[in-house]
Amino acid sequence: MDPKYIRNFSIVAHIDHGKSTLADRMLEATGAVQKREMRAQLLDDMELERERGITIKARAVTIHHKFDGHEYQLNLIDTPGHVDFNYEVEKSMQACEGAVLLVDSSQGVEAQTVANAYLAIEADLEIIPVLNKTDLPHSRPEEVSEEIENSLALEATDAIRISAKTGENVDQVLDRIVERVPAPGGDPDGTLRALIFDAVYDEYRGVIVYLRVVDGSINKRDRVRMLGTGKVYETIELGRFQPKMLPSDGLRAGEVGYFVSNIKQLGDVRVGDTIVLDKGPEAEMLPGYKEPQHMVFADFYPTNPGDYQGMRDALETLCLSDSSLAFEPVSSDALGFGYRCGFLGLLHMEIIEQRLEREHDMDMIQTAPSVTYQILMKDGTEGWIHSPGALPSPDQYEELREPIARVSMLLPTEYIGPVLQISTDHRGNFVRQEHLSPTRCLLYTSPSPRDRQKSRMPSSA
């Protein structure tokens, strides 16, 4: 397809604002799924996602929409809403030119609305504000539009008002995507360059690589090379997501799809790597991704010592589909051999634990979660401490620095006093306050001056 008729976009929002429901309605409206096959959260195929009603893993799907006499190919990436899975959102945005910013018109702008909007702005995406749940009696679209403008500096007076539950005005969202999201750049006739934005492991087919073709084209039986690892593979199967994997003969510049090459070694695929033709002209590597910053650490020990290697295999498999997970071997006098794992947050840790138990039948003991500390030694060197047992004696180091966070809090005005008190009790320092609407405000806090002097670690918002 001509790239000028392709649009790549994601849906971003705070948790429970209706992302997956809107994706369902888009699939229905474009005829991508037959009514008899339709079910809620169609793209959320992980058991834990359907059980909890949340999106954990980003999903891609290709749909077709007619506008102004032309048929457009829309590549949709449905992303998670919880802060612990922000890395999934960030990866997905690298494969897009636009983002639908979905806001619950009864709840208004919330924490992940702001965080995901900032990610979209940093990725230079065209942002389309959409107000959901306008069919509810307590919906307040005018106020929420004002909140979007005040907190994010985005024009929202013409934000589309929809009900993802009933499908009202979803067709207008599709039209707006075609109108405002730019067509993908790149050279359709140039040398192949494709970005790996995700990968999953299939027991029978091996690693399935998700890619966005930036330049050129990739065809079945092509021999391709990954610039980061230098590995060469033959594309045995490639295709698009509609929403199930549908094989095709090739993918062109601007398209999103997958390929299979009997890749069995999990470490051979790196999210953010660039794919080129093996015998083609030299190509420059595409910008990759920032390494995820692990905020929480915990140790996992198999209850049966014989399962040590099995736990390693399970963690390696999870690492392929979740590149924000990290682990390393660890030992304990009481618990034996296990693995110390790094997570983006407590929910991320809980999800990984449950996936190990359900998908890999692991019976294990988990230690209490902890954070990483930075240590300044007497000789001037710096290091990282992941557990109390790794802390040297006090006469060997000058400073022990704990993580800090600069926090923005969106809340109803009646809770300002109690929230400030809790913040102060936890060593927070009030910075400033902004009123987004008559009923909602934005508070900024940071660590107290004493803590800022103690620590020079990077902050997180």
Model-derived regions, located:
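Positively charged, low-complexity/disordered segments
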Residues: P449-D451, S455-A461
